[in-house]
Amino acid sequence: MEDKKKKRSPKPCLTQPAQAPGTLRRVPVPTSHSGSLALGLPHLPSPKQRAKFKRAGKEKCRPVLAGGGGGSAGTPLQHSFLTEVTDVYEMEGGLLNLLNDFHSGRLQAFGKECSFEQLEHVREMQEKLARLHFSLDVCGEEEDEEEEEDGVTEGLPEEQKKTMADRNLDQLLSNLEDLSNSIQKLHLAENAEPEDQPAA
């Protein structure tokens, strides 16, 4: 049991009891086994997982240096954070304010004039337009396939098909124009706001 633990972690962790300086123990790995068997892993991890393991290994375990430089051998080193605690509290407060604004509906995307309801309306129009465009495309393909299979054009006369296609195309263009106008209003509101602020 003890041998398996040593094989799994050949590098001594700082949390383990410290050894005398200059005495690093190496666990012999049989040459007949692959690296994954020597580590007790069932298979080699993917490249992403390997990078994750490397990072986790660097953070958790560090070999004890021969010189013993930088602290006593018996006490573990503490991780030093690059971010100040006050900065973390400030970011936390900002995120909480953002969350409160989101839940209250005060969150603005393109300025004070544009709300998420307007953006939601634009998104719904885009989806409606995409569905209409897709259904027109599918209907046209199905009609072409039916005509090829039958060899004879049954169903609607050619003139009716043309008027129906024109009507659908007009509806598609009308929806596209509405969508374009809505997006244009959002952009105009966004561009107008920076001009208003310096004057105030």
UniProtKB/Swiss-Prot annotation:
Pfam families: CCDC28 (PF13270). Residues 140-152 have a biased composition (Acidic residues). It is found in: Cytoplasm, Cytoskeleton, Microtubule organizing center, Centrosome. One of its GO terms (biological process) is cilium assembly. Keywords: Acetylation, Cilium biogenesis/degradation, Coiled coil, Cytoplasm, Cytoskeleton, Phosphoprotein. The modification Phosphoserine is found at S46, S115. Residues 1-49, 140-165 are annotated as: Disordered. It comes from the Eukaryota. GO terms for cellular component: centrosome; cytoplasm. The modification N-acetylmethionine is found at M1. Expressed in the retina, pericardium and limb epithelium. Residues 158-189 form a coiled coil. Residues 1-10 have a biased composition (Basic residues). Interacts with BBS1, BBS2, BBS4, BBS5, BBS6, BBS7 and TTC8/BBS8. Interacts with MAPKAP1/SIN1 isoform 1 and RICTOR. Involved in ciliogenesis. Regulates cilia length through its interaction with MAPKAP1/SIN1 but independently of mTORC2 complex. Modulates mTORC2 complex assembly and function, possibly enhances AKT1 phosphorylation. Does not seem to modulate assembly and function of mTORC1 complex. This is Coiled-coil domain-containing protein 28B. It comes from Mus musculus (Mouse).
